[in-house]
Every structure is written in C-alpha cells, then in structure tokens.
UniProtKB/Swiss-Prot annotation:
Its main location: mitochondrion. Belongs to the cytochrome b family. A ubiquinone binds at residue 201. It comes from the Eukaryota. This is Cytochrome b.
C-alpha cells in the first residue's frame, strides 16, 4: 500500500515542502533563518490576535487599552511584551536571512529574491503601522513625520498625505485605518511567504559552495527538521529572555507618555530596526531626495541580481568581495547608530559618508570587484 503521505492531495503538498524535499547536504546554520521567520510570523499573528481582542482603535482609549492589557488581562503583559520583542527578533532574522542571500549569491534565484524584497517591504510597513497603535508620544510623532514624507511627491503629495491621514492631521481616522492595515497585512505576508517558498522549491536551495548540488541531496526530514529545531530553541529562548527580563530594553521611554499633538519629543526616531533607513533619509538635506534615498535603500536589493558580474555564485571563494560584504555589514551598523543620534555635527557628516558608502558598495564596488576577480582568474 502506498503511503498516504505521498498520495493524499493535501498531505502530499506538505510532504513535498517539508518532509521529502531534496535539500543540499552541506547547507549551514545560515539556511535556518527562513524557517525561523515562519516561526516568528506565527508567533506575531497569535500574540497579535490576542492583543486585538482587548485593544481599542480609538484615540481616546487606545493608550489606556494597552495599559489595561498589561495590568488587568490574564498574562496580558506577557502577550504584549512577546509581540513587541517578537518584532525585534523578526527583523534580526530578516536581516540575517537577507545577508545570507547576499553572501552566498542566493539572489540569482531571481523570482524568489524579488518576492523576498516585496516581503521585506510588507513587513516594514506592517511594523510601522503597528508602532502607531499604542498611541504614545513616539507613536504619534513617528506617524506624523513618516507619513508627512509623502508630501514630497510632486503635484499629488499633499492630497496623498491627507488621504492617508483621513483628515488634516494624524487623528482618529488614521489610527483606525492603521489598525485595519496592521491586522490585515500579516495574512498578506503569509500568502506571499507561500509564493516565496513555491518559487524556491522550483529551483531548490542554494548551498555554501554555490555549485550545483543535484548529485548530493538528502531529505529535509529528519536531517534539517531536527537541525532547524536547534535554531527554534535558541530564538525562542532569546525571545523569552528579552520578554521576561528586559521587556522595555528595545522600546522608547517616550512611548510611556500618551500622545500629545502640542508637545514634540526632543528626538523623534523609529524603532531600532528602521534606524539605518532613517539615517539615510536624514543624510540628504532635500525632502524629496531624502524620500527617494529612503525607498532606494531597500529597492537597491532588486538590482543586486542584475549587477552580479562574477563568474562565481557566492563569496565563499572570493576574499576581496568578502571584505566588501563585511564593510557593508559594518556600514549598516554605523547607519543604525547614527539614526539614533541627534541631527548635529559630527553625526550628520558620518551619516552622509555612511550613506554614500552604502549605495557605492551595492552599485559600484561589489560589481567592479566581481569583474576584476574574473580578470585576475582569466575568466573572460
């Protein structure tokens, strides 16, 4: 009798996705982050659902409803802290997942990569609208500053901003629609993740050597299902540690004050995971230029497959490109630090240099190095 796992129409799909999936035998722990992102997404949807049961999307009660969740709801403090810190962990996993793709040349699977970039943007939008919901000072002013950037769009800018606000300022209509978006988008992300996986399984996974691995593949289960569990354990332990010992470590103290349109916080800044993009935005003194740089800082990822010049796929055997990759990582960390600093000398200058370096690495230095490496190897 044939195994039901291989014949049942539904179970067969699951089987081909996570059980009998042919996987390169040499993939490292860096390939763990895809499944970790799945775990993060499920955690966020579950905790978010429970929070939505008690939250009220109205400017008069939003802040106090969050306080009510933390004080009066059974384990509400735990659900809220897990949701807030889960977002930070989600972004750590995303950035490591993207870094792995850049290092090992996974971006040459173009469809998977492009859907991945769209997923990144969807997650960033979801996190932004979610940050507005507690209706603290930083929530309100963050929403005001970031939505205001759309006024830089020529001709239709002001109309666009008012359309998003649902009025002439960030108000009740804005909060209500942001809650609607924050509730809806995770399910859109889930759907896009399935498409991401579908495209990935068309070609199969890349591996650390960047070579064809058809001759040496193993089943995903039990080898990598157990290997992934170690990653789950480490990630969930980190999340539990953050949530139970330092729940407010990554938050902004300003958000413990209810939103007040009449007083501006001394430093308006987003959550830590957006600071690199915020630093790039601030490094250009022109409003439209800053907005374009902000969007380009993410969309530049779409150009990576087009600008791949090397005859080799990954950076495993390319020491010069490896140096540039780690320079990019260092540059991102510098931008993250600068994004949290006030707009004054020397931070502005450092931010401008780091922003130029960021785009130069993607658009000029790494493609040129690939070409030079080909020349050095006589691979014309």
């Amino acid at each position: 009798m044939t195994n039901i796992r291989k014949t049942h129409p539904l179970i067969k799909i699951i089987n081909e996705t996570i059980i009998d999936l042919p996987t390169p035998s040499n993939i490292s722990i860096w390939w763990n982050f895809g499944s970790l992102l799945g775990i993060c997404l499920i955690t966020q949807i579950v905790t978010g659902l429970f929070l939505a049961m008690h939250y009220t999307a109205d400017i008069t009660t939003a802040f106090s409803s969050v306080a009510h969740i933390c004080r009066d709801v059974n384990y509400g403090w735990l659900i809220r802290s897990t949701h807030a810190n889960g977002a930070s962990l989600f972004f750590i996993c995303i950035y490591l997942h993207v870094a792995r793709g850049l290092y090992y040349g996974s971006y040459l699977q173009k469809e998977t990569w492009n859907i991945g970039v769209i997923l990144l943007m969807l997650v960033m939008i979801t996190a932004f609208v979610g940050y507005v919901l507690p209706w603290g000072q930083m929530s309100f002013w963050g929403a005001t500053v970031i939505t205001n950037l759309l006024s830089a769009v020529p001709y239709i800018g002001d109309t666009l901003v008012q359309w998003i606000w649902g009025g002439f300022s960030v108000d009740n209509a804005t909060l209500t629609r942001f809650f609607a978006f924050h509730f809806l988008l995770p399910f859109v992300i889930s759907g896009a993740s399935i498409i991401h996986l579908l495209f990935l399984h068309e070609t199969g996974s890349n591996n650390p050597t960047g070579l064809n691995s058809d001759a040496d593949k193993v089943t995903f289960h039990p080898y990598f299902s157990y290997k992934d569990m170690l990653g789950f354990l480490i990630t969930l332990t980190t999340l539990a540690f953050l949530t139970l010992f330092t729940p407010n470590l990554l938050g902004d103290p300003e958000n413990f004050t209810p939103a007040n349109p009449l007083t501006t916080p001394p430093h308006i800044k987003p959550e830590w995971y957006f600071l690199f993009a915020y630093a790039i935005l601030r490094s250009i003194p022109n409003k439209l230029g800053g907005v374009l740089a902000l969007v380009s800082s993410i969309l530049v990822l779409l150009l990576v497959p087009i600008l791949h010049t090397s005859k080799q796929r990954g950076n495993t055997f390319r020491p010069i490109t490896q140096m540039l990759f780690w320079a990019l990582v260092a540059d991102m960390l510098i931008l993250t630090w600068i994004g949290g600093q006030p707009v004054e000398y020397p931070f502005m200058t450092i931010g401008q240099i780091a922003s130029i370096t960021y785009f130069s690495l993607f658009l000029i230095l790494i493609p040129m190095t690939g070409w030079l490496e080909n020349k050095a190897m006589n691979w014309n």
